[in-house]
């Protein structure tokens, strides 16, 4: 098993991509640490995957991030974060206070994560950011979301140089069939799934297990750093 003896921290690990990555990492022999904002969901997720440890705090809180990593009893090997939700609004309706909070959550929090985590990560370990493909698919209401998805790869590339030999990569996910997607789409979820099955080149909907498989590959292939990897089923090439 490729991750035996290694520790993987999943920020946003109580559901969706984070939880599925925890399952995949455990299947490869890793110890997993789950971080999230809901103690109840974390407890259920920890029981599901057999997590070594959990921590409940808001990953957008710099002090909480630094306390968490400082308090870990041992060095770690990999960190994956899926924390932070996109802010959707056309320019005419943009709430700049909310937009600023979203930038804090999407950009500054990721820098705080790198600064807090890097000293605790063993050489050739990884920081993995899960972002999106919005910068390549402009649409009304996606101004801020696109800007954040464009900024993340540039930030990660710079961090890969500064933090070497710790590796830093980005997973750019398109639509992924997660509980968050279900909450956002509500009654429109089935229609969206059907549309994607008809239009995506792969002929199916991308699931969290697809993202998790790539995450584990990026943890174990030590030649990969400073890059962005798409998991969107070819969505960026079609108007799906």
Model-derived features: positions:
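Conserved glycine-rich cofactor-binding loop
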Residues: 14-15
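C-terminal substrate-recognition "lid" of short-chain dehydrogenase/reductases
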Residues: 204-231, 236
């Amino acid at each position: 098993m490729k991750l035996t003896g290694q520790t993987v921290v999943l920020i946003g690990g109580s559901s969706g991509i984070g939880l599925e990555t925890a399952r995949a990492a455990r299947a490869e022999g890793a110890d997993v640490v789950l971080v999230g904002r809901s103690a109840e969901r974390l407890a259920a997720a920890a029981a599901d995957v057999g997590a070594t440890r959990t921590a409940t705090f808001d990953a957008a809180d710099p002090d909480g991030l630094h306390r968490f990593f400082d308090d870990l009893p041992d060095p770690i090997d990999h960190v994956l974060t899926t924390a932070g939700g996109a802010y959707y609004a056309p320019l005419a309706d943009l709430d700049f206070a909310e937009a600023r909070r979203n930038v804090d959550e999407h950009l500054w929090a990721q820098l705080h994560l790198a600064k807090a985590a890097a000293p605790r990560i063993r050489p050739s370990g990884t920081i993995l950011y899960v972002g999106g493909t919005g910068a390549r698919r402009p649409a009304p209401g996606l101004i801020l979301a696109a800007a954040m998805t464009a900024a993340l790869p540039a930030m990660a590339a710079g961090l890969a140089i500064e933090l070497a030999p710790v590796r830093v990569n980005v997973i750019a996910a398109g639509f992924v069939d997660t509980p968050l997607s279900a909450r956002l789409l509500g009654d429109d979820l089935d229609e969206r799934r059907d549309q994607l099955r008809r239009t995506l080149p792969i002929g199916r909907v991308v699931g969290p297990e697809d993202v998790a498989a790539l995450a584990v590959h990026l943890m174990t292939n030590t030649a990969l750093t400073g890059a962005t990897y798409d998991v969107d089923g070819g969505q960026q090439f079609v108007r799906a």
